[in-house]
Amino acid sequence: MTREEVRSVILDRLELRPGAVFWDIGAGTGSVSAAVALACPEAEVHAVECEPEALALLARNRERFRLHNMAIHPGRALSVLDALPNPTHVFVGGSGGELSELLSRLTRIPVRSGLLRVKF
């Protein structure tokens, strides 16, 4: 789980606006996804995670905090990115050893705002 201080810095640096489409790649238990969903209820939050235990906690946290603007996408990031809406913001919390390929893929994705922020 990402520490609270780190989540605060992430939220500050992302400069989220209503209508944002946020990808949390390697979402883990969803602490960053939940923070974004709570801070910007008008944003679409897409949490990508492949570990079964983390997915269970991610789903539990989504229900616990009633995060209706957060979707969970099980699987490895490189296999699910094409099914997601184009992002305005991306946070890479984990890459499963595929960071180089993931970053290469992210640079080829059309971005709604014309600017893609990748924070990791």
Cite the ranges covered by each PLM segment:
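Conserved alpha-helix/loop element of class I SAM-dependent methyltransferases that forms part
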Residues: 3-18
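Conserved S-adenosyl-L-methionine
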Residues: 38-45, 109
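Conserved SAM-binding loop of SAM-dependent methyltransferases across substrates and taxa
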Residues: 29-41
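Short SAM/SAH-binding signature in class I
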Residues: 86-94, 101, 115
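Short beta->alpha hinge that forms the Motif I/post-I loop of the SAM-binding pocket
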Residues: 49-54, 94-95, 120
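A short glycine-rich, Lys/Arg-flanked "PGG" loop and its adjoining helix->strand segment in the class I
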Residues: 103-115
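Conserved class I S-adenosyl-L-methionine
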Residues: 19-28
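S-adenosyl-L-methionine
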Residues: 48-89
